[in-house]
Amino acid sequence: MDKFVKLTGVAAPLPVVNVDTDMIIPKDYLKTIKRTGLGTGLFAEARYNEDGSENPDFVLNKPAYRDAKILVAGDNFGCGSSREHAPWALLDFGIRCVISTSFADIFYNNCFKNGILPIKVSQEDLDKLMDDASRGSNAILTVDLENLEITGPDGGLIKFDLDEFKRHCLLNGLDDIGLTLEKGKAIDSFEKKNAASHPWAA
């Protein structure tokens, strides 16, 4: 998993509340367990017309936001059924940070396991960031995980809080496998001691 230390990029505004996982990645795209290629299905029902052509009114189809790395979204983002394909689709599209006032718990935790930073802010701060994100190609935000702050295009700072363990994992690029490997020496030591004290179980 790639480390997340500081991210600077275009922020796309999605002022919609209760965006559920079916909206993020429709069920038709859940037939694969591969993490790559799902970016095409991200918000598919909103991004594409019935004939498969792009909907020019959807934010991620607009020229200024095609390479967005940050999503500023409405309250309760990622609600609905549990599907890890949702953060996979965001990541495959290129989005590594989602900012909202709240997230569904399962989606929130799945983000950290896949290298995406979900940030919770107050409604006042979200309104400011949504306004910043509406500036098109000038909607540049910098998310600094080390200092827990977001810098807007006008230089304004917004602080945010994050669980220290989750912060450590993102800063060091540690998913579940990485966390296990990080404890490799301790695991090896335990296995040797356990084998010596319980030779019949070796």
Swiss-Prot record:
<keyword id="KW-0456">Lyase</keyword>
<comment type="similarity">
    <text>Belongs to the LeuD family. LeuD type 1 subfamily.</text>
</comment>
<comment type="function">
    <text>Catalyzes the isomerization between 2-isopropylmalate and 3-isopropylmalate, via the formation of 2-isopropylmaleate.</text>
</comment>
<dbReference type="InterPro" id="IPR004431">
    <property type="entry name" value="3-IsopropMal_deHydase_ssu"/>
</dbReference>
<dbReference type="GO" id="GO:0009098">
    <property type="term" value="P:L-leucine biosynthetic process"/>
</dbReference>
<dbReference type="InterPro" id="IPR033940">
    <property type="entry name" value="IPMI_Swivel"/>
</dbReference>
<comment type="subunit">
    <text>Heterodimer of LeuC and LeuD.</text>
</comment>
<dbReference type="Pfam" id="PF00694">
    <property type="entry name" value="Aconitase_C"/>
</dbReference>
<dbReference type="InterPro" id="IPR050075">
    <property type="entry name" value="LeuD"/>
</dbReference>
<keyword id="KW-0432">Leucine biosynthesis</keyword>
<protein>
    <recommendedName>
        <fullName>3-isopropylmalate dehydratase small subunit</fullName>
        <ecNumber>4.2.1.33</ecNumber>
    </recommendedName>
</protein>
<keyword id="KW-0028">Amino-acid biosynthesis</keyword>
<dbReference type="GO" id="GO:0003861">
    <property type="term" value="F:3-isopropylmalate dehydratase activity"/>
</dbReference>
<dbReference type="InterPro" id="IPR015928">
    <property type="entry name" value="Aconitase/3IPM_dehydase_swvl"/>
</dbReference>
<dbReference type="InterPro" id="IPR000573">
    <property type="entry name" value="AconitaseA/IPMdHydase_ssu_swvl"/>
</dbReference>
<dbReference type="GO" id="GO:0009316">
    <property type="term" value="C:3-isopropylmalate dehydratase complex"/>
</dbReference>
<comment type="pathway">
    <text>Amino-acid biosynthesis; L-leucine biosynthesis; L-leucine from 3-methyl-2-oxobutanoate: step 2/4.</text>
</comment>
<keyword id="KW-0100">Branched-chain amino acid biosynthesis</keyword>
